From Swiss-Prot:
Residues 20-42 have a biased composition (Basic and acidic residues). Residues 1-57 are annotated as: Disordered. PROSITE patterns: AMINO_ACID_PERMEASE_1. Belongs to the amino acid-polyamine-organocation (APC) superfamily. YAT (TC 2.A.3.10) family. Keywords: Amino-acid transport, Isopeptide bond, Membrane, Phosphoprotein, Transmembrane, Transmembrane helix, Transport, Ubl conjugation. There is a cross-link at residue 39 (Glycyl lysine isopeptide (Lys-Gly) (interchain with G-Cter in ubiquitin)). High-affinity transport of valine and tyrosine. Low-affinity transport of tryptophan. Can also transport L-cysteine. GO terms for biological process: amino acid transmembrane transport; amino acid transport; transmembrane transport; tryptophan transport; tyrosine transport. InterPro entries: AA-permease/SLC12A_dom, Amino_acid_permease_CS, Amino_acid_permease_fungi, APC_YAT. Gene3D superfamilies: Amino acid/polyamine transporter I (1.20.1740.10). This is Valine/tyrosine/tryptophan amino-acid permease 1.
Length: 619
């Protein structure tokens, strides 16, 4: 059997399928850990001694284990159980509960909680909601496609950044990997700057102090590897989601006149100052900000190589994305638009330099006379910013590791320690994080805008590449006569959903180009500075793409469907046919029907089937 291919499931009944996989994975993990321990004893030449239980010896042992964890992973030839795995193994420490919370809350930070204030001022309330609505349709199609590929290539380091290289074109894969890696490397200082801006709501103390505190905090979290990241995100995202729920309830009460110092508000701000700020061009400014706000949701796939049971966790997380879109993004955005006028001087990007710029969530509550609560909201916004900084320090090193394994970066960066941490890549990310100490500069908001310029457009490129990869994957499966039963999870939006996502992404890029050459606030006149602030990622992508073409002298623009390698790196699922599943379900239903007291109702089994299908679809 080819080492690069993992046959995850054999012929089995539907009920035994996921259970047997989990049992085998758990037993193999135990066996592997035991074998590694034996090998370590053989290499050291020492006989295992009974462990002393006094506190001093325990402390010494813990310290030794901590320092030893930074050593390079044991080479594969010391353990036959590891020979079939990737060269650098990332620790499988992320559980299903972590992944569900990551899919719901990761990425809720700068874009939604802070950056929305700027685009509200340029687009108006109706423009902001319309832009987010279109972006939401695209995102759902993308995540469904990415979930299908994510389960097929769960063990691939770098995950979706390597899909284009395998399924579309190596040059496209290289360009997307480069720009996406740069995005996550710049997101870290962006969040540090945002943290300093958030703290200024309370105090005017030197911002670099807070940058240093947040920086050290996320470093400590990530020193615990993927487990530390996952547990921290579980806590952070729980706080964010609770804040969102609380904000929704409070915002409705305020709008109805039940809190604060004002009467019923209703849709007052949609009439005065109005629904749109700058017409259709204002709506176009929303698209990239919406993409940036939704960014980070794909991290659930990047962590696939470190998940204990991706067969269960990835489909569940992908299905729950719709709740994040509707409840966390769309609903909160609509409520903010009902409580904050787009001409408010307190919004980020306002022309009034004397205003105290704050998050639109804080403005929505504080401007209507509600006391204390804005401080809690601002505190959760700070937690959200720290959460995204934590995600960037998790994602950035793993993307660098993927580039190093592909030979794009020096091989020394492929160093992975015994706890599964890409250590040298981690240090490179820390260097980029130091940019965050410009928070004390007078040009703080300018730095924020430039860092956001790199991040926002990059998100569209990675999403488009994921959809293109899914399209080419389906084309190759059909062309080579492969069955879709080999796929563990099928995208609910199907083949054409990916085409819709690609078309929307292209539309966004065209709109962003229009806004870049004819900015809203420049009265349609070209401004080079504003152009690059809106379109900075495009030159990076083009340079990386054509540079790769020239260097490798590869002039084909895609891999033919019949030549796409569908075996290497892919998990192949062999599940029972649909006919067999139906037979099992029918037999079970028949027994339940005969033994049930309500067997007189012939529609009972049919209703149970319908309920089960609905549950599987939404949950």
């Amino acid at each position: 059997m080819d080492d690069s291919v993992s046959f995850i499931a054999k012929e089995a009944s539907p009920a035994q399928y996921s259970h047997s996989l989990h049992e085998r994975t758990h037993s193999e993990k135990q066996k592997r850990d035991f074998t590694i321990t034996e090998k370590q004893d053989e290499v050291s030449g020492q006989t295992a001694e009974p462990r002393r239980t006094d506190s001093k010896s325990i402390l010494q042992r813990k310290c030794k284990e901590f320092f030893d964890s930074f050593k390079r992973q044991l080479p594969p030839d010391r353990n036959s159980e590891l020979e079939s795995q990737e060269k650098n193994n990332l620790t499988k420490s992320i559980k299903s509960r972590h992944l569900v919370m990551i899919s719901l809350g990761t990425g809720i930070g700068t874009g939604l909680l802070v950056g929305n204030g700027q685009v509200l001022g340029t687009a108006g309330p109706a423009g902001l909601v319309l832009g987010y609505g279109i972006a939401s349709i695209m995102l759902y199609c993308i995540i469904q496609a990415a979930g299908e590929l994510g389960l097929c290539y769960a063990g691939l380091t770098g995950n979706y950044t390597r899909y284009p290289s395998i399924l579309v074109d190596p040059s496209l894969g290289f360009a997307v990997s480069v720009v996406y890696t740069i995005q996550w490397l710049t997101v870290l200082p962006l969040q540090l700057v945002t943290a300093a801006m958030t703290v200024k709501y309370w105090t005017s103390v030197n911002a670099d102090i807070f940058v240093a505190v947040v920086f050290v905090f996320v470093i400590i979290i990530n020193l615990f590897g993927s487990r530390g990241y996952a547990e921290a995100e579980f806590i952070f995202n729980s706080c964010k989601i609770l804040m969102v729920i609380g904000f929704v309830i409070l915002a409705i009460i305020i709008n109805c006149g039940g809190a604060g110092d004002r009467r019923y508000i209703g849709a007052e701000y949609w009439h005065n100052p109005g629904p749109f700020a700058h017409g259709f061009k204002g709506v176009c400014t929303v698209f990239c900000y919406a993409a940036f706000s939704y960014g980070g949701i794909e991290v659930l796939l990047l962590s696939a190589a470190e998940q204990e049971n991706p067969t269960k966790s990835i489909p569940n997380a992908c299905k729950k994305v719709v709740y994040r879109i509707l409840l966390i993004y769309m609903l909160t955005t609509i409520l903010v638009c009902f409580l904050v006028p787009y001409n408010s001087d307190e919004l980020l990007g306002s022309s009034d330099s004397s205003g105290s710029h704050a998050s639109p969530f804080v403005i929505a509550v504080a401007s209507h006379g509600v006391k204390v609560v804005p401080h809690f909201i601002n505190a959760v916004i700070l937690i959200s910013v720290i959460s995204v900084a934590n995600s960037s320090l998790y994602s950035g090193p793993r993307l660098l590791l993927s580039l190093a394994e592909q030979g794009v970066l020096p091989k020394c960066l492929a160093y992975v320690d015994r706890n599964g941490r890409p250590l040298l890549c981690f240090f490179v990310s820390l260097v980029f994080g130091c940019i965050g100490f410009v928070a004390t500069s007078d040009a703080e908001e300018q730095v924020f805008t430039w860092l956001l310029a790199i991040s926002s457009l990059s998100q569209l490129f990675i999403w488009m590449s994921m959809s293109l990869s899914h399209i080419r994957f389906r084309d190759a499966m059909a062309k080579q006569g492969r069955s879709m039963n080999e796929v563990g999870y099928k995208a609910q939006t199907g083949y054409w959903g990916s085409w819709l996502a690609v078309l929307i992404a292209i539309f966004f890029l065209v709109c962003q180009f229009w806004v870049a050459i004819a900015p809203v606030n420049e009265h349609g006149k070209l401004n080079v500075k504003v152009f690059f602030q809106n379109y900075l990622a495009m030159p990076i992508v083009l340079f990386a793409y054509f540079g790769h073409k020239i260097y490798f002298k590869s002039w084909s623009f895609w891999i033919p469907a019949e030549k796409i390698d569908l075996d290497s790196h892919r998990n192949i699922f062999v599940s029972p046919s649909l006919t067999e599943i139906d037979k099992v379900d029918d037999n079970d239903d028949l027994k339940e029907y005969e033994n049930s007291e309500s067997s007189e109702n012939p529609n009972s089994s049919r209703s149970r089937k319908f309920f089960k299908r609905m549950t599987n679809f939404w949950c």
